[in-house]
Regions:
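Glycine-rich, highly charged phosphate/nucleotide-binding loops
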Residues: 1-9
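A short, GP-enriched loop/loop-strand-helix hinge that lies immediately N-terminal to
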Residues: 13-56, 71-74
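Active-site nucleotide/adenylate-binding loops and adjacent lid/helix of ATP-dependent enzymes
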Residues: 54-140, 162-163, 197-200
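Phosphate-binding site of ATP-dependent enzymes
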Residues: 118-178, 193-200, 221, 227-229
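Glycine-rich phosphate/pyrophosphate-binding beta-alpha loops
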Residues: 175-187, 234-248
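Oxyanion-binding "anion nests"
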Residues: 181-184, 192-217
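Conserved metal-phosphate-binding beta-hairpin within the catalytic cores
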Residues: 207-242
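Peripheral (often C-terminal) accessory segments that flank ATP-dependent C-N-forming ligase machineries
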Residues: 257-346
Length: 346
């Protein structure tokens, strides 16, 4: 069905240059798996199926981190067979998250969250029992909690060309994360930053594995060891990757210049000052605890170096504007309701 739908669309638009871009893990796998069937009709950059499977599944990604000298949190796992008896190799709190994001997306149970934090054994037992009481039956990743607020996170977006070389890297420092159950781990505001040492290490990793296309990494700075620890790699753009385009580095340009125009891309590190937001600035002002980062956000706002994800002036009809205002007001409500709640509570 995937291939037929796309080839039918291509037939209806013959004579046009068609570019494919995956926006989910599942579509990246399908694109990689059906590359030969789609290449006659579409232009795209895509990793191999083997690379996707080895790096998208968290347990395999951590093995790749070990091989390439990249740090990650102390990690264990459990299965539906042993989750009641598993012993953690670290102290609570414990992060609990699925190893198979696609399977978890399709499961349902009360108070489901994208990621859980268990602060003691009782909470651990309740959370794992709830997850395995659903249709999700794959392993769970159990991970030590890295201390620090949301602003200790980093998000890295990269584009690797058809030549398997990295051509664009953009690093962001989240100021605040989403707080809703389904939004935990998604970013609500990102400050564009630069860290050459970190980028050099990640560039070497991507080129060593022969990656092609977009990649997105989440990591957190661990002040105890003075290093970044990787959480995951997504084989696509991230939900908040527009922060790169908003800072002046249009992600689509790198893709089109590569797969359509076949231009030499060189190597670019995005380093323009910019603040990207999906949350209202008032929410950031209230919940961002670091005074220096808040001052930086206020400065960028005053200088007009701010982009609002949901605000597009070219699409600002009266109906859209009313929706935008309602959405922002609702953001205050849902942040207050869910702030700090990563347990099995509603």
């Amino acid at each position: 069905m995937f291939v037929k739908t796309l080839t039918d669309f291509a037939a209806e638009h013959s004579g046009k240059t068609l570019v494919l871009l995956s926006c989910s893990d599942g579509y990246t796998i399908l694109l990689a798996r059906n590359r030969a069937a789609l290449e006659p009709y579409y232009k795209f950059a895509c990793p191999t199926e083997e690379n996707v499977m080895n790096l998208d599944m968290k347990e395999y990604f951590y093995k790749a981190c070990e091989k390439h000298g990249l740090s990650y949190p102390k990690t264990s796992s459990c299965t539906v067979q042993n989750y009641r008896e598993v012993q953690l190799p670290f102290e609570f709190p414990c992060i609990i998250k699925p190893s198979n994001s696609m399977a978890y997306w399709n499961c349902h149970f009360p108070h489901k969250k994208k990621v859980f934090v268990a602060y003691n054994q009782q909470e651990f037992n309740e959370i794992t029992a709830a997850i395995y009481g659903s249709s999700y039956q794959d392993p769970l990743i159990l991970q030590e909690y890295i201390p620090g607020d949301d602003n200790c996170m980093r998000v890295l977006n990269c584009y690797s060309g058809l030549d398997h070389k990295v051509h664009l890297m953009a690093l962001g420092r989240p100021l605040l994360e989403e707080q809703t159950p389904e939004g935990i781990g998604n970013y609500a505001a990102i400050l564009s930053v630069r860290d050459d040492a970190l980028m050099a290490k990640m560039k070497a990793f991507l080129e060593d594995v022969g990656w092609e296309g977009f990649s997105n990494f989440d990591m957190k700075f661990d002040a105890r060891t003075n290093e970044y620890k990787l959480f995951e790699m997504n084989p696509r753009q991230g939900r908040s990757s527009f922060f790169v385009t908003a800072s002046g580095y249009n992600l689509a340009k790198w893709l089109v210049d590569d797969v359509v125009e076949h231009k030499p891309l060189g190597f670019t590190i995005a380093d323009a000052e910019s603040l990207w937001m999906i949350a209202p600035f008032g929410v950031i002002r209230k919940y961002l605890k670091d005074p220096d980062l808040l001052a930086e956000a206020i400065r960028l706002k005053k200088q007009g170096k701010v982009s609002h994800q949901l605000l597009c002036r070219e699409d600002l009809s009266v109906k859209r504007l009313l929706w935008y205002i309602k959405s922002h007001l609702n953001y205050y409500r849902k942040t207050a309701k869910y702030y700090g709640n990563k347990s099995l509570r509603g």
